[in-house]
Amino acid sequence: PAVVL
């Protein structure tokens, strides 16, 4: 994914 928390 583009954002990994």
UniProtKB/Swiss-Prot annotation:
Top-level taxon of the source organism: Eukaryota
Listed name of the protein: Unknown protein 8
